[in-house]
Structure formats: C-alpha cells, structure tokens
C-alpha cells in the first residue's frame, strides 16, 4: 500500500455492515434515503475508500477493488430489496385506506323534486297520446276572433269585457277570414287552439290542447290570474254524448284511480250544445267519497264547426275541458292555490322524483 494512504478494508466492511443492518430496520422511504446518503453518499466511508484505491500501489489496487466491489454490491442488494418491500407496504396501506367498505350503510343523497303541475300536465298528455289523440299547442297571445268569435261568443258576451279578459294594447291582427282589426288578447281558454286545429288539419280530428290561460282573477285560495287548462276536441262522423261520457270516465280513472267516475249535469256554454257540467266522484275526496265539480263539456255547437268550414250536417263532435290546478288540488288534497304559484321549494319536496 502506498505511503500515507489509509485503506482499511476491515473498517469499510464494518461500516457497510452497520449500513445494511440499518437498512433492515428502516420502515419508510425517507429512512432508507437517509441511510443511503450516510453509507453510500459523497461523504461516506465507502466513497472515501473507493477514491483511496487510486493512490494504492499497483499490486494492491486489484485486491482493494475486489473488496470494494463486493461491499458496494452487498449494500446495493440489501437496499434494493428493502426499497421494494417498503414501497409494496406503502402501496398496500394506501390501497387499504382507499378501499370502500361495502358493508357500510350508504349516505343517501336527497332526491330531486319537480313541481307537480308540469308533471300532472305530462300525465294528462300521456293519457290522450295513449288513446291515439294528437297534442296541440297554440299561441298564448291570441286573436279575439279565435278566442271568442269562432267559439260562438256574441259581441256583447260578458267574457269579452276588460274586467274578465286581458287585452294586448295596440296590437291588431288578421282573423281567420282575413279581415284586419281583430284585437289581440291573452287567451282565456285553450279552446281557441281547437278551432286552429280544425282549420289546419280538417276532420276527422282528435286533439288535446293543454296550456296556460289568463283571466283577470285575483289570486286567492281557489283562483289565480294565470292557470292551466287541458281542453279536448273530437270531431268525426256519428259522435254522440255517449262517446263523450266514455272518454270522461276513462280520464277520471286515469287521474283519480279505478273507483273514480264521472257524471254530467245540464248547463250552458256558447261553444257546445247541449252542454254539461262535469262532476267527479272519487273515494279520496276531502270530507269523504262524493261528487265535486271538475270541468265543463258538451257536443260542439254547429256554429263552431261552421267557423272552421266544417259541415255540421255531416260531422259532429264533443269537447271538454278541465283545470289542471283544480285537478291537482283534488288529487293531492291541496288547500290553497298559493302553494302552487309561490315557488316554495318545501312544497315541491313533497313530490320527489319517482313518486
């Protein structure tokens, strides 16, 4: 060994043995990295000894190189084995922490809730579609001709007065006959769309007309100035009141259950003749099973058919209408119309999705 150069193989071997022992005791990657820096880093005994080999005599270098190569390999093998073991343990611990325990009770998310009014509108539309009828959607800003004249309302009928109907200021349009000067109104009934259907599609015709209508009513427990109707019209050859009654019975069952039924009481409407009030019987009526007014109906007045260019000597028809809000009030025993229009989410939450 060259003079002045200290190369103590036993000391290096002892130091590496301590490093390997420390590796065996390590449990984290941080501990392993610290051990590697101490026993194999730039300032470690192993690194200093490796540098010292270059200063040894030629005949001593080969033997010293073998010693250092074996020590370096022993340390590297111990470090690599332990590193793989620690990483595997850490990954297993992370996986266990992230694993979902399928036996734990789930956290239920609150179900969404739709407002019951559009849901009921869809139910009514589905009823008519199931019978093969068409769904018609007309304009809410309507000509006075379609809303009144074509439906056999006389020029002096009380419904035309401003205390009952919203007139659109400054707007005039052509009526179905092409005459300019028909005032525009917010439609008071979806019956106006029935006349449009007759003119557009001709006969035979089976349509349901759901939609929003407007009256100058004050908002109270049973009235609102903006509400929804579903009106239905059937025009064909040889239709009678018996056909009307059959459809009404089916609608009552669809809306209120298998025990529900309908009855007709004589009445008057300008657009039907004969006309009838539609009463509903159902077992869940507030106060006990019984009859309650539901809507209006009748055979289409011949004058209405003539307005649409239909010959009443060949075709007959029936029509009826029910209020969607009223149906909802009866169906769910709701006491106040305010609940339907004020947008209180607590009200809608009673009608969660799927119910």
UniProtKB/Swiss-Prot annotation:
EC number from the UniProt entry: 6.1.1.20
GO molecular function, one term: magnesium ion binding
Bilayer-spanning residue ranges: none
Catalytic activity: tRNA(Phe) + L-phenylalanine + ATP = L-phenylalanyl-tRNA(Phe) + AMP + diphosphate + H(+)
BP GO terms, sorted: phenylalanyl-tRNA aminoacylation
PROSITE patterns xref list: AA_TRNA_LIGASE_II (PS50862)
Major localisation: cytoplasm
Cellular component, GO annotation: cytoplasm
Protein name: Phenylalanine--tRNA ligase alpha subunit
Keyword Ubl conjugation found: no
Alphabetical list of Pfam families matching this protein: Phe_tRNA-synt_N, tRNA-synt_2d
Keywords for this protein: Aminoacyl-tRNA synthetase, ATP-binding, Cytoplasm, Ligase, Magnesium, Metal-binding, Nucleotide-binding, Protein biosynthesis
Record InterPro entries: aa-tRNA-synth_II, aa-tRNA-synth_II/BPL/LPL, Phe-tRNA-synth_IIc_asu, Phe-tRNA_ligase_II_N, Phe_tRNA_ligase_alpha1_bac, Phenylalanyl-tRNA_Synthase, tRNA-bd_arm
Subunit structure as annotated in this protein's UniProt entry: Tetramer of two alpha and two beta subunits.
Cofactor note: Binds 2 magnesium ions per tetramer.
Leader sequence segment: none
Subcellular location(s) per record: Cytoplasm
Binding site for Mg(2+): 273
NCBIfam families in UniProt: pheS (TIGR00468)
Enzyme class: ligase
Similarity comment text for this entry: Belongs to the class-II aminoacyl-tRNA synthetase family. Phe-tRNA synthetase alpha subunit type 1 subfamily.
